[in-house]
A protein has these predicted regions:
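C-terminal ends and interior cores of transmembrane alpha-helices
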Residues: 95-110, 300-312
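Hydrophobic core of transmembrane alpha-helices in multi-pass small-molecule transporters
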Residues: 31, 113-128, 316-330
Length: 387
């Protein structure tokens, strides 16, 4: 049992210069990744709609394929990093994502819906590794700095709130008559940049003892009450957010006839809501407890749905999606922090990999359902489904 003096010493442990550098490097990578992902959420759905014409049942398939790729890549990428270390894992997967973005661009030029989706799938594989930025920053950080480190890395995603959608507007017509083809060139550049910048992280690899230690069975770890709360909160928070966010461009542009700039504005502020709270979510967790922050996040997501059901004007979409983003941040950051408490270093890969597999499998299902529910039943029923 840890002695009181040791506990007091742990509480006073200050983040080292290495910890701060890891936060900075991974925050930049998170910002670039979220710029690319925000770009994809906006452009891929509209690209799907352009390719499919009036039949919008499968307009969200590109987003679904990205999320299927992310779900499929969660466990392999976690084990890749266990084997080669965080740095090598991030570099390798960024190259896969870059190839995927280039393939998507080429498929657009050839008007190949299947090829476009395959490229998006490869980008999703990279996304599985990029989701590990939040875990990686906590690997070597002192316990009292973990929540803040995680929230600061997630906060950097606020860059994507504006860079992603603005990049879509600037690049959607640069390659001539094929709308959005140039956007996926930008996606390739964002993705490649993360693989270069991440070289600057300094996270120790597992020791020989940690690597050979298989730890407890996965089922035993995930059946702990803390682990159950962590996985459920992260999964539901992401599924609800993704269901509504994926359908929003269709609802605004196709259903309600709002202009592209209004849709971009709503998505930008949704992303601000998702990531800007990260500058203080860690402090809120340390002050009010992680469970209270998760509960507040769930309440905000419910409020978001209520506002969306009231009306479909631009202000309704704006406030609803903004609250949806804040709610997601509280729930997801809280779930991530809880998950770091249930495993040892040797158990890290399988626990984090399975957690993200569950989360992104749920997201993929929600994404596919979003287009189908919207096509047959409309925007209000998408919101009822979120409830």
């Amino acid at each position: 049992m840890q002695q009181p003096s040791e506990c007091f010493k742990a509480e006073l442990t200050m983040p080292s210069s290495r910890d701060k550098r890891n936060v900075l490097v991974l925050a930049i990578c998170q910002g670039l990744f979220n710029s690319g992902r925000g770009l994809t959420f906006l452009a891929a759905t509209l690209t799907g709609a352009n390719m499919l014409g009036d039949d919008l049942r499968f307009a969200t398939v590109p987003i679904t394929m990205m999320l299927v790729g992310t779900a499929a890549g969660t466990i392999p990428s976690a084990h890749l990093m266990r084997w080669l270390g965080r740095k090598a894992g991030f570099i390798i997967t960024s190259l896969i994502g870059t190839v995927g973005a280039i393939l998507s661009m080429y498929a657009l030029l050839e008007n190949s819906f299947i090829g476009f989706n395959f490229g998006i799938f490869l980008f999703g594989l990279y996304g599985a590794a990029a989701q590990q930025y939040r875990f990686a920053v906590a690997d070597a950080a002192p316990d009292n700095f973990k929540a803040k480190a995680i929230s600061l890395v997630l906060a950097a995603g606020v860059l994507g709130a504006f860079i992603g959608p603005e990049t879509v507007e600037l690049t959607k017509d640069v390659l001539g008559s094929t709308e959005f083809a140039g956007t996926f060139v930008a996606l390739a550049l964002f993705t490649l940049a993360t693989g270069i910048i991440v070289i600057g992280i300094d996270i120790p690899r597992l020791t020989r003892e940690e690597y050979t230690d298989k730890g407890r069975p996965l089922g035993e770890i995930l059946l702990q009450p803390v682990a159950i709360v962590a996985v459920i909160s992260a999964t539901l928070g992401y599924v609800i957010m993704n269901l509504l966010m994926t359908a929003t461009p269709l609802a605004m542009l196709v259903g309600e006839g709002h202009v592209f700039n209004d849709t971009k504005f709503v998505i930008e502020w949704h992303a601000v809501g998702m990531f800007a709270p990260g500058f203080f979510t860690g402090s809120l967790i340390n002050r009010f407890s992680v469970l209270n922050v998760i509960i507040v996040g769930a309440i905000l997501q419910a409020a978001s749905v209520a506002i969306a059901l009231i009306g479909s004007s631009v202000p309704h979409f704006w406030v609803s999606l903004f609250l949806l983003g804040i709610g997601w941040n509280f729930v997801f950051t809280g779930g991530t922090k809880l998950l770091t408490e249930v495993h040892t270093p040797s158990e890290r890969a399988k626990v984090q990999g399975m957690n993200d597999f569950i989360v992104f499998t749920g997201m993929a299902i929600a994404s596919l359902c979003a287009g189908t529910v919207y096509h047959f039943l409309g925007w209000q029923w998408v919101n009822f489904a979120a409830l």
